[in-house]
Amino acid sequence: MAQTFTGRKRIRKFFGKIKEVAEMPNLIEVQKASYDQFLQIEEPKGGRDDDGLQAVFKSVFPISDFSGASMLEFVRYEFEPPKYDVDECRQRGMTFAAPLKVTLRLIVFDVDPETGAKSVKDIKEQDVYTGDIPLMTMNGTFIVNGTERVIVSQMHRSPGVFFDHDKGKTHSSGKLLFAARIIPYRGSWLDIEFDAKDIVFARIDRRRKIPVTSLLYALGLDNEEILSTFYEKIPFTREKGGWRMPFDPKRMKGYKAVADLIDADTGEVVLEAGKKLTVRAGRQLAEKGLKALKISDEEMIGQYIAEDLVDLTSGEIHAEAGEEITEKTLKLLEETGYNEIPVLDIDHVNTGAYIRNTLTADKNVTREDALFDIYRVMRPGEPPTLDSAQAMFHSLFFDSERYDLSAVGRVKMNMRLDLDCPDTVRVLRRDDILSVIRTLVELRDGKGEIDDIDHLGNRRVRSVGELMENQYRVGLLRMERAIKERMSSVDIDTVMPQDLINAKPVAAAVREFFGSSQLSQFMDQTNPLSEITHKRRLSALGPGGLTRERAGFEVRDVHPTHYGRICPIETPEGPNIGLINSLATFARVNKYGFIEAPYRRVVDSKVTDEVVYLSAMEEGKYYVAQANIPLDKDGRFEEDLIVCRHAGDVLLVAPDRVDFMDVSPKQLVSVAAALIPFLENDDANRALMGSNMQRQAVPLVRSQAPLVGTGMEAVVARDSGAAIAARRTGVIDQVDATRIVIRATEEADPSKSGVDIYRLMKFQRSNQSTCINQRPLVRVGDQVKKGDIIADGPSTELGELALGRNVLVAFMPWNGYNFEDSILLSENIAKEDVFTSIHIEEFEAMARDTKLGPEEITRDIPNVSEEALKNLDEAGIVYIGAEVRAGDILVGKITPKGESPMTPEEKLLRAIFGEKAADVRDTSLRLPPGTTGTIVEVRVFNRHGVDKDERALAIEREEIERLAKDRDDEQAILDRNVYGRLIEILDGKTAIAGPKGFRKETVVTREILTEYPRSQWWLFAVADDAIMAELEAIRAQYDDSKKRLEQRFLDKVEKLQRGDELPPGVMKMVKVFVAVKRKIQPGDKMAGRHGNKGVVSRIVPVEDMPFLEDGTNVDIVLNPLGVPSRMNVGQILETHLGWACAGLGRQVAAAMEAYYGKQDLKPLRDRLETIYGKDEIEQLKDGELPELGENLRKGVPMATPVFDGAHEADIEQQLEKAGLDASGQSTLYDGRTGEPFDRKVTVGYIYMLKLHHLVDDKIHARSIGPYSLVTQQPLGGKAQFGGQRFGEMEVWALEAYGAAYTLQEMLTVKSDDVAGRTKVYEAIVRGEDTFESGIPESFNVLVKEMRSLGLNVDLENS
């Protein structure tokens, strides 16, 4: 536990009892693995896998022209390095992407006009640029136009075949109508369904239905083949007085005898009329030797003939296959001498006559008719020809260009239909369609089960890579059409591949996907947890998915297969509930896109440490025990009956039947839910709110990790990328607020730099305007291992997620101020900036080139006082550090005005001063209302070729200095490493040559070396060739590293000095970042982790707050009535355990005081050992204990993992250890009277978050502002600086009070009476208090509208 660099500084006491054998996978692996598989950036030796981009190119190429005289082949692709790195893209508003270069080969053929034989005439190969492909950042996001976006994974129905019924809803009788649907990955859907009359129909792409036999005719089957495919034949032989039928007990089980059943050989009655033939009786009769039964003519009537009965001499058909036998038929057959008739095995009990009835009902009788019918359904209005109908039918299901089941679809189909077909066959086969129809008919006969479409074996995940692959294929197919046309229109002998390719459609498809797809979302960057959750989200919405309106209850519901795969708790409240889910903590997505959960294998009742990942389909076959089943020390089950999950049910089974066991109790829930301590004590609805609200917690100025955590905090901080982890093991060389330099000590590869420089983000703006700020945790000389946390980010503390603060809470009412979930706070909280957060707002000003002339960014603004310009520099841009308020100028800008006719005075001025006086207007960027803050950053962007102003040059110089310092530091460490290595090699060796003044054959020592400048050390030579070769290698490596370092520096400087790519018409752009400090205030929303949310109602002076016996004031008072009805008792347990944490912290603080007094570490070590146990503390060195003690003063942090955490007894034990009352309650005194309250009160530490719903962002008041163009009424909404709507009901209220004048004002001068508004202003200026109301503009609009309808309305004076 405590072996990491930060883990040793503050150890969490862990309550979990279950050993975790599997490491939790990286939390953003879903995104990274999928996109890496799509790109396959590095080409391996044997070539790339047929996956992702490679698969797309292979499926579209080769492209041949229409005549077949030339062909364009795909050879390979490679990525060039991206033009800008991640930070540059963020700042410049660019997309972080790499150019894709594809090598194409154009082959031109000579075609012999007579034979049509082809011979290669010419082959040309060329690299062609085919647009940029966005790259994923280290944290699993994309940067598109300067903003971070996430591609959410989509859950959709897996390709394959599904059997279902309508649940009796279609027909009034409630009859179940069965249906099968074959869903491909790409191509036409095929539905096969029963109607109410039990006729089987097929539908293609949900169009008009056709009898399924027409589909079978189109597949090349005839009547007889269709019947023989779906039915067995029974040969009936004529005998004296009836017919002989072979006896088959399996076939005849459940047969109810209409007449006596008679043995054909002996004449005995084997079953009396009216009785049923049971399975047992049938088997006994067969054993007794019953071979055949005698059947009367009456019983033959109603059977169906299995084959065409044809007179071989004349060719006359006496009876057709499928024809029902009647008395007439029997007579005819008797006359024509048929003694043996093959009959279809249809008994209407076990086997129904559905296919035979469909044949009879089908109007089509030949393949041609069927093909024409299908053609008319698919392309109504077009006259069919046999060739076109055949080609169209083939292209529907059997053409790999148009139809793709995908490997997943084929695997699913094989499993469902018990077929054995390789997953490379991705089109339908005849056997597939026949198997589907056969299975459907069996379902109608009562054999088999329908599928559950909400089972996770039938739903799969499309991650980034796959979504991008589909989009890229769309772009390439658009390009293919253009290439084909161009190949036939140009002189193919002279063109190169480059001339045929236009990469625009591909680039547009990619851009469209990242810019406007429903699954490409603006990343929720409120805090690290919200980032991680966003990347692990699964959405059922989006293209090809469900829509909110159509999704029913079943799709949204929790399914047994969600266990360990999808979190049953975390989903949004509202219309998207259940459609947007979160991946469970240990879940992963396999190569087919199915979600897998990990399990420990159980062998002979012994649980092993082998971890197996199972998909939902595989898991259904096994018995799976839960993670909290008690085991003995050998890993065997202690109990005789084990609770197991099997095929969606929960059962009790013997230990020897258990196959697998859960890996961890928290594999059930998502990351956010796994961060809630005592989750098992909360109601699910509140847990849902708790996990959703943690994502809205604003990063605080000084956040704290929770005293009561779950052990997941460090994992989230590490995987989110908010905290910086060391890339390599090494020693800290330099640290300051903006960067950390680490000298790598274990780098074996000499070609890699021995230095890692980590740039820390300082006061950067996130997507949600929260503040991203990183702080170093290391000091110079510290040794860190790979993966250790070296800097905290937003909402992290000592490498652990810290979304809020631990505050002292009392659960009690307080003068009604915590009525209905309101929260009462102490003034201390506001004063000490406990819940203060910094928000960074971004404002931008653009200087455009207008028709009247260019706009200008300047300090010289007309009609503006010097006072208003006090924060601007000479370039007209605000200083960094300036305090600004609403209305202050951030960037001075003037825009040319249209030429207006000049007055004689202006002409005179122009003649005297020779300049335009004031033909510009002020369009400066001002701070909007409701904002005050400090300028933290200014960025200036200039178009290429535009002269940079002083401010832009100053920013550029500063940036170059920063880059130069990085280069110099890296160079210094490189020098130190290389020359240190030289000293080690040369020290003690005899030199045969050296610099000027050095005597040969002298032993080189460190002292001698220090007499010469370092650059001359290379001149020393020794006799040993091996050493000289090593020196040469080091020298070459050193020179190469220096050159690379310098080149990197020059490239970056060149990028800086080069102009920026700005939108068309923009000459210059200035971005200003304002940091706004938001203290907590009444109206802000706060919440705990258990769904206990509320709004701050009042901030009370410290002296009025309730206080404990030692005089400590509580920080926050919550209403106890908010707990019982909500059933989120977890918050009370957290409070008790938090109280114990703080008590133990006070004990550690006392031990620390003793250490500072006597320098004796023993009391501290003893105290820590009683808290954590000996094993944990023994690993720590003496030097590490004081720092640990200091970090524990405020409280000893504890981890209580979900479903495996502290129990009531554990909490009581900790309270007793801390010397506190085991009830967790304390006597509180009223701050206003000093009297104790009548009863003891639950007091403790609870973790509270400040949420992103801040009152400052919501409250708003309008003075004078913009009006709507047509109605002249004030606009609405805070963003438009709008007014409050005085609506219908408000008008009723004034009418009810008879406030006539107020009402008239509201409807006229305070709204849209334009002339009246001006008159009111004038009257106020003159000091009068009377004015007249005119006609509201909206009335004029109504009049105009009526006139437009031809009704003339005139207003008469009355």
UniProtKB/Swiss-Prot annotation:
Task: For this UniProt record, give its keywords in alphabetical order, as a comma-separated list.
Answer: DNA-directed RNA polymerase, Nucleotidyltransferase, Transcription, Transferase
One matching Pfam family, short form? RNA_pol_Rpb2_2
Secretion signal span: none
Q: What is this protein called?
A: DNA-directed RNA polymerase subunit beta
The UniProt catalytic activity note for this protein reads: RNA(n) + a ribonucleoside 5'-triphosphate = RNA(n+1) + diphosphate
Q: What Gene Ontology terms describe where this protein resides (cellular component)? A: DNA-directed RNA polymerase complex
* Transcription as UniProt keyword: yes
- Which family, according to the similarity comment? Belongs to the RNA polymerase beta chain family.
SUBUNIT field: The RNAP catalytic core consists of 2 alpha, 1 beta, 1 beta' and 1 omega subunit. When a sigma factor is associated with the core the holoenzyme is formed, which can initiate transcription.
**Any idea what job this protein has?**
DNA-dependent RNA polymerase catalyzes the transcription of DNA into RNA using the four ribonucleoside triphosphates as substrates.
Q: Recorded E.C. number(s)?
A: 2.7.7.6
Keyword Transcription applies: yes
